């Protein structure tokens, strides 16, 4: 090559023309990705052309020597927040610290601060993002030289990031300025996320004040049951509210359309519904049973407290259902919720099958809510393909009252 450019119109599809000293071939085309041939007129074929990966993911060809037991000819390198073979699954959903889907017993810490003569417990279960109140976060003991707080997710999940927030204690801002993240599959042996190029444990940047949010996404998603945050530098005290981001390992746990109203009202029905003081204007209709629904009448309430009552969702077509989130509500100050329930499913809305664990003879009873507002998430060990889903209350507090979301794909 002479290194000089020539008329690029000689090369098609955006190719760059370079002069060549060979008289047989006076110019050479540098073809853009996806094109080949003397004048870039042929579409390049191969496992990565066209790119099979979604969401701007990079496609990398695997050569035969390194393929081993991997039968695909390529892998997709997913950008932050995506997962799946083709990076088609969004994996940065809040895992439940803020909503209460992660229960108090799942959160533990090395220590906690006891304030105001020991009456104020800055306990680990308070470390929930945006939690309000005077005592509204976790604070490590002043005497704890190696503080940490951890979450047991109860099963292996894909964890892709963390959102941290400080709090105000005794009128002063306290927060975590830098921290490490450790993880474990068994709760005994922990490893730290590593920095780039063997630089040791990765140090994450934390907060700058007591109320702002700091999002840190992990370079490589974790597939773990336990996640531990380890403060390194704190402002005044090691005080923390936080949320974990990620998704189920299956990737099939997206909301199926109750909360966002993609399931229309007519597809949400029930055995009956309650009218406060018998007035139609004060009806707790089935289609109010949408997770986090707001308003004075914001949930489904059954007419009677009976195990024969049910709430039914028609998904419109057959879907793979992998889990459920339930929530109670409040009726003029009275806290109401379903404390335990069964799940049934049907393809035609007539013939029903109660969900049961593998090998079980009876329908599984799922633990429900403990209050009117927290989320309670239950995942099905054996997901099912269905169109119709029924929730069958077994135990309740005050009245049978439900807000709900189904999960799946």
UniProtKB/Swiss-Prot annotation:
SS bonds (residue pairs): 6-17, 11-29, 31-40, 48-59, 53-76, 78-87, 91-247, 234-238, 252-409
Record bears the keyword Membrane: yes
Domain EGF-like per the UniProt entry, residue ranges: 2-41, 44-88
Domain named F5/8 type C: residues: 91-247, 252-409
Glycan-modified residues: 41, 372
Any matching Pfam family: F5_F8_type_C
Tissue specificity: Mammary epithelial cell surfaces and spermatozoan. Also present in testis, epididymis, uterus, adrenal gland, tonsil, muscle, heart, lymphatic gland, thymus and kidney but not spleen, liver, lung or brain.
Motif Cell attachment site in this chain: 67-69
Superkingdom of the source species: Eukaryota
Annotated GO biological process: angiogenesis; cell adhesion; single fertilization
Matches recorded under CDD domains: EGF_CA, FA58C
Assigned keywords, A-Z: Angiogenesis, Cell adhesion, Cytoplasmic vesicle, Disulfide bond, EGF-like domain, Fertilization, Glycoprotein, Membrane, Repeat, Secreted
Membrane topology, record value: Peripheral membrane protein
Gene Ontology cellular component list: acrosomal membrane; extracellular region
InterPro entries with a match to the protein in the record: EGF-like_dom, FA58C, Galactose-bd-like_sf, Neuropilin_MCO_CoagFactor
Compartment(s): Membrane; Secreted; Cytoplasmic vesicle, Secretory vesicle, Acrosome membrane
Entry domain remark: The F5/8 type C 2 domain mediates high-affinity binding to phosphatidylserine-containing membranes.
Function noted in UniProt: Contributes to phagocytic removal of apoptotic cells in many tissues. Plays an important role in the maintenance of intestinal epithelial homeostasis and the promotion of mucosal healing. Promotes VEGF-dependent neovascularization. Specific ligand for the alpha-v/beta-3 and alpha-v/beta-5 receptors. Also binds to phosphatidylserine-enriched cell surfaces in a receptor-independent manner. Zona pellucida-binding protein which may play a role in gamete interaction.
Alphabetized PANTHER family for the sequence: F5/8 TYPE C DOMAIN-CONTAINING PROTEIN (PTHR46806), F5_8 TYPE C DOMAIN-CONTAINING PROTEIN (PTHR46806:SF5)
The protein's name in its UniProt record: Lactadherin
Species name: Sus scrofa
